[in-house]
Amino acid sequence: MHPPAPDAPILFFDSGLGGLSVLGPTRALLPTAPIVYAADYAGLPYGRKSNEELAARVPALLGRLVERYQPRLAVIACNTASTIALGHVRAALDLPIVGTVPAIKPAAEMTKSGVIGVLGTEATVRQPYVDDLSARFAGGKTVLRHGSPGLVTGAEARLRGETVDPEVIARAVAGLRDQPRGDAIDVVVLACTHFPLLKDELQAGFGRGVALIDGAEGIARRIAHLTDGQAWPAIAVPGIAVFTRSDERPPPPLAVLAPYGIGSIETV
């Protein structure tokens, strides 16, 4: 396989804007990397879709995007899509694919109380994959889960400069705290890439004694490792954001995306 051209982009894919929480740390490690950020607004929210629907939708859409933008690597910057469709995507596409998995392993290493919370979408927290991660890396620990669709909507609103409903945060916190042993949680895994965008609000809700962790920096390091030795442009060029068309959800203003190095918006 020939090495990629310097202008071959990294493709980030999410249901919405949550993947920006992964793009940020990646930009820090690879500041001149060309970026295509794709958000499936026509399919948002993924957390309420069936496994079968996502297993068909995500590989098909990524296939179109790969054909159009010819990336050197694709990042599924979405826990729900990764836990359900990562294997299907890897089988369908002939390029490196980086997925997003709940950070249960580092949470298990960090907890002192032995009680870990996992906050994700409804689809992510019901996956057997999360059972497997818990069994492999958190044996002997209590792993409590809660699916919070409201946080996805809240994160999208937050990025647009809108106020986040405090009740959304309170319900997410209570969803873990009100379970048996929930009061002993000292580490919460943010198992949706949207949720770190609300880290300040969630930290206030859980209290300073609870550590909030996510996998974004680990994913960025993985991307840097997989592209080590490849050529990049000498200077950064503005990235492209691509949104699937949605009548009820127009793309955000470019000003929302500009801090992440995005310079233009397209729809497909």
Curated annotation (Swiss-Prot):
Keywords: Cell shape, Cell wall biogenesis/degradation, Isomerase, Peptidoglycan synthesis. Substrate binds at D14, S15, Y46, G47, N79, T80, T193, H194. This is Glutamate racemase. Its EC number is 5.1.1.3. GO terms for molecular function: glutamate racemase activity. The active site is at C78 (proton donor/acceptor), C192 (proton donor/acceptor). It comes from Sphingopyxis alaskensis (strain DSM 13593 / LMG 18877 / RB2256). Pathway: Cell wall biogenesis; peptidoglycan biosynthesis. It catalyses: L-glutamate = D-glutamate. Gene3D superfamilies: 3.40.50.1860. Pfam families: Asp_Glu_race. Provides the (R)-glutamate required for cell wall biosynthesis. The keyword Iron-sulfur does not apply. One of its GO terms (biological process) is regulation of cell shape. Transmembrane segments: none annotated. It is an enzyme of class 5 (isomerase). HAMAP family: Glu_racemase. Belongs to the aspartate/glutamate racemases family. The keyword Cell wall biogenesis/degradation applies. It comes from the Bacteria.
